[in-house]
Amino acid sequence: MAGLLKKIFESGKKDVKYLERKADEIIALADETAALSDDALREKTVEFKERVQKGETLDDLLVEAFAVAREGAKRALGLYPFKVQLMGGIVLHEGNIAEMKTGEGKTLTATLPVYLNALSGEGVHVVTVNEYLAHRDAEEMGVLYNFLGLSVGLNLNALSSTEKREAYACDITYSTNNELGFDYLRDNMVVYKEEMVQRPLAFAVIDEVDSILVDEARTPLIISGEAEKSTILYVRANTFVRTLTEEEDYTVDIKTKSVQLTEDGMTKGENYFDVENLFDLENTVILHHIAQALKANYTMSLDVDYVVQDDEVLIVDQFTGRIMKGRRFSEGLHQALEAKEGVTIQNESKTMATITFQNYFRMYKKLAGMTGTAKTEEEEFRDIYNMRVIEIPTNKVIIRDDRPDLIYTTIEAKFNAVVEDIAERHAKGQPVLVGTVAIETSELISSKLKRKGIKHDVLNAKQHEREADIIKHAGERGAVVIATNMAGRGTDIKLGEGTIEAGGLAVIGTERHESRRIDNQLRGRSGRQGDPGVTQFYLSMEDELMRRFGSDNMKSMMERFGMAEDAIQSKMVSRAVESAQRRVEGNNFDSRKQVLQYDDVLRQQREVIYKQRYEVINAENSLREIIEQMIQRTVNFIVSSNASSHEPEEAWNLQGIIDYVDANLLPEGTITLEDLQNRTSEDIQNLILDKIKAAYDEKETLLPPEEFNEFEKVVLLRVVDTKWVDHIDAMDHLRDGIHLRAYGQIDPLREYQSEGFEMFEAMVSSIDEDVARYIMKAEIRQNLEREQVAKGEAINPAEGKPEAKRQPIRKDQHIGRNDPCPCGSGKKYKNCHGKEA
């Protein structure tokens, strides 16, 4: 252990030496840079950009660029970065975490690597915890960037897509972590590439990096959509399919557990739901509900595939016969079963897109962060983000007095002592900041101070504008501020007149937080830049942390010594507290690591889907190649399921293939039983694919190429988005329920990974099938736009068109039942002159 500590300490010393050497090189250019005029200094930015274009790396430019940014800060802001700030800037440029104590000027430090990395033209994101800080920093530091000829954008929640796009197009963009994550998710839901707002993620500097990448790491960002408006469609579809007759209206393929409507069944469906063509894109929702109702009623059996318990449909594992708690069938099949069995149909709001901060920020090419407290989480930053934590020395020696903890037997005794301490310090004009872990603690202390007539402010992290204002004045003579869990991070407490003589800022902690880092943050508010200050934590044996980690012996020991109301200062207790904190931190790290392992399953799937969507949206030419692969996989599956080359021909179900092709891919009768007999499985596939290719060729002639390309995009995006949202929903249910299945030797994570993979593969097959069906069977409507598809609605193209001129009927044409009637009425042939025929 000692050897390990020695190694770490020595590597830290090496880091500092290297940074000092580099900072000295920058300082050596100070006079030369100071001699440049404002215009010449600004011209340096243009020169640097050109050099990057010609192949110089940002590392090559670091010393010169930092010197220019440093001189720029002196002229534009009246601030001249110290040597330690240059060192911090180098750490950030290298994609690591600079641990800089409070008041050491982190905001100014960040301007150096931000300026350097903005020269690449790829955009730099500066990330803060709230919009107030993003706004403040963009405004204040923007003066420097603009002075040096760079553009600065501020990305806020209230902006329109156009305004956001402009903010992201700037060299430097200030934003909150939430807004960046949500914009990424929204970008992957758009249907036109012009609607995307973000550029590829290049470099981000995160302020208060521990808060965002550790404390909020487990928080998922979720965009949820309305669940199906009502469950009535499930009930209607269920009622409809129960009126159908097997063979006449539908066929069942036992092997693949699939059900197909026949032509008669389709006509009945169109009449029942009062639509012209079930395969129109505007009727996808109806067709989907019918398909699931057919499956629920005619391929799934109660007490075999599922059971009903307590008004709920529960899935039965086909291999073990166990009930799979928490698992729901996806794509509305579960709701179809609920409608079939007459139990309550559950419809939650749907998660349309989701990502955690861990996975969002790991997508940047380079990530850096700064904070006053990161050393305690060093292992986590290294393991999960591949970032090192490097301590930057302070500009001036810290002279703050950090006193040992005072420990009381009861909470009541502790709070009385806290209030007495505040009153004494207040009386001599010393400013006091009181840190609490919970809101109720701050209210309790506040009421005690009111009774003593001590004027004070209470801060809960709700109103950022007012918060910053209170924190600004917290260092004035006699000020008392009670803050919950370090509200007001990011705003410095500067000492007012006469407070140095009173001892500087006193920070009082009312209990230890479960994380040492949060305690250190509170301590760090005092003694900034060599100011005097004092910090004191008050503990009691009844505190949450002490209760959780067995302090009964200590409590009885204190009572034995008759110290029920008095405090003790004990190194032993302080050590016990610290080891309890270490244990909690370890547990929290493990839990965050586990969340990441679960989230990684969805991350890999999300990357596949988002990449596919991006390719579709960006495609300039026909997507036929992609679609034909989907059709091929679908035909391959249907043929091999019904006519496997590993089975004797007498076991083949050729009629099953014909039923599927008739219902989903080609006009009825295109392929007959005679066509398929006496062929190999491979020949059957090729025959069907040839017929589909000919039908596709014919379909392409119906529209100009750009419009047909648009039709293909509409179908692909509609199907992929619908299936993906259903899949996320199903994965949510799986994850919620997987721990309920931890029987025997089963590892829930392994189970989640393998089932999640199976579900993803099933979704991909389902996408293939639906795309094949809609491409081959949907009628092409000329003004069906992607935007309408994204909202799940499509305008009836017959509305608002000039009335078509009626044409004479020619008997010699072959007219399909779903083709437009040649008389020009705008109706389908089967609903017009087809009736008479």
UniProtKB/Swiss-Prot annotation:
May bind 1 zinc ion per subunit. It catalyses: ATP + H2O + cellular proteinSide 1 = ADP + phosphate + cellular proteinSide 2. It is found in: Cell membrane; Cytoplasm. It comes from the Bacteria. Zn(2+) binds at residues 821, 823, 832-833. GO terms for biological process: intracellular protein transmembrane transport; protein import; protein targeting; protein transport by the Sec complex. ATP binds at residues 85, 103-107, 492. Residues 827-837 have a biased composition (Basic residues). Residues 800-817 have a biased composition (Basic and acidic residues). Residues 791-837 are annotated as: Disordered. GO terms for cellular component: cell envelope Sec protein transport complex; cytoplasm; plasma membrane. Pfam families: P-loop_SecA (PF21090), SEC-C (PF02810), SecA_DEAD (PF07517), SecA_PP_bind (PF01043), SecA_SW (PF07516). NCBIfam families: PRK09200.1, PRK12904.1, secA. Belongs to the SecA family. This is Protein translocase subunit SecA 1. The lineage of its organism: Bacteria, Bacillati, Bacillota, Bacilli, Bacillales.
